[in-house]
Design a protein with these regions (language model features):
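Alpha-helical scaffold elements adjacent to nucleotide-binding pockets in ATP/GTP-utilizing enzyme cores
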Residues: 90, 127, 152, 156, ...
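Flexible active-site lid/hinge loop adjacent to a nucleotide/diphosphate
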Residues: 153, 166-194
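Signal for well-folded cores of large energy- and translation-related assemblies
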Residues: 23, 37, 41, 64-68, ...
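Long, well-ordered amphipathic alpha-helical subdomains in the mid-to-C-terminal portions
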Residues: 15, 223-225, 239-317
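Conserved beta-strand segments of the P-loop GTPase G domain that flank and frequently precede/overlap
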Residues: 110-111, 162-165, 187-190, 223-225
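Canonical P-loop GTPase G-domain recognition
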Residues: 185, 191-251
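Hydrophobic positions on the alpha1 helix immediately C-terminal to the Walker A/P-loop
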Residues: 59
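Nucleotide-state-sensitive switch-loop elements of NTP-binding domains
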Residues: 2-46, 51-54, 63-149, 156-171
């Protein structure tokens, strides 16, 4: 309970240590998270996704500044599924977050899979819960790309911002089946660049030809211009924060927030099952060398992956109703 009390009091060192232990699958970390869970569920969670180089870190930083201006405490979870957070060019833009380093109302944490078994989504969900238990009013989850893992991660959010930049018009069509469907707010970043008007037109056309989703929310489009014009950029960031808050209020008033919470709970249960069942089985098969043998048999077409999986399941899982 000491860990719980410290985290609830906002102790950054304790929170960082627990997130690291959860990320590294340290024994005992899961029990501490269980104790914290009853103190979660009160934060507003925002997901930010978009192509690499779209300026997501810049927008996340601007939103942190805006929410702090509104006297909200903020947690930021920067997710990198490709490299350990010991440095690297991909983290360059996140250096901007250092301006909040001395602000006790802001807690910034980065995550990486480091090759661990299981989905990155669960690790992100665990970190979100730690930040919730710290009492953060707003939690911003920033992903690096727009792959399936990133889409899974933003499903932990109440509201999702999809960041677009001029020059990626062709990508809008490609993203239809994935990212476009999860957007609650569109942010056209670097809107002072050539092609911004075309991008906004294509986006408006896409939204105009898309059926109004159940619940009646049509994603608004917020344009953000030159970072080096602080006053204008700050005003645009304020508008972005306002639109996201309006979406959250819409979820509450329309009664659709419960659906998002159930979706989030379903994902967490699925990830927890994967962690509790699949990971131990895979670890056992790897340590005994069985997985390598199975892989060889399937690769040589001596058997199929479905039969191998069924055989493993029959060994490790107790079938309901079996005697």
């Amino acid at each position: 309970m000491e860990t719980t009390n410290k985290i609830r009091a906002g102790d950054v060192r304790t929170a960082s240590r627990l997130i690291r232990d959860l990320e590294d699958r340290i024994p005992g970390a899961r029990r501490k998270l269980k104790d914290l869970f009853v103190h979660t569920g009160k934060s507003f969670i925002i997901g930010i996704t978009g192509s690499p180089g779209a300026g997501k870190s810049t927008l996340a930083d601007a939103l942190v500044h805006e929410f702090r201006r509104r006297s909200k405490t903020v947690g930021v979870l920067a997710v990198d599924p490709t490299s350990p957070f010991t440095g690297g060019a991909i983290l360059g833009d996140r250096i901007r977050m250092l301006r909040h380093a001395e602000d006790e109302g802001v807690f910034v944490r980065s995550l990486a899979t480091r090759g661990a078994l299981g989905g990155l989504s669960q690790v992100a969900g665990d970190a979100i819960h730690v930040m919730e238990a710290m009492g953060k009013d707003v939690i911003i989850v920033e992903t690096v790309g727009i792959g399936q893992q990133e889409l899974d991660i933003v499903n932990h959010a109440h509201s999702v911002i999809v960041v677009l930049v001029p020059g990626m018009g062709d990508d809008i069509q490609a993203m239809k089946a994935g990212v476009m469907e999860i957007a609650d707010v569109f942010a056209v970043n670097k809107a002072d660049r050539p092609g911004a008007g075309q991008l906004q037109t294509e986006l408006a056309t896409l939204l105009g030809t898309t059926a109004i989703p159940e619940g009646g929310w049509i994603p608004p489009v917020v344009s953000l211009g030159n970072l080096y014009e602080p006053a204008g950029f700050a005003q645009q960031a304020s508008e972005l924060a306002q639109k996201v808050m309006e979406h959250y209020n819409h979820l509450i008033v329309s009664g659709r927030l419960s659906g998002r919470l159930e979706r989030k709970a379903m994902m967490e249960i699925t990830e927890a099952l994967r962690s509790s069942i699949l990971e131990p089985v895979l670890s056992r098969l790897m340590s005994t060398g069985e997985l390598k043998v199975m892989t060889g048999r399937v690769a040589n077409r001596e058997t199929d992956p479905y039969s191998e999986a069924e055989a493993v399941a029959s060994r490790f899982l107790k079938v309901e109703g079996a005697t």
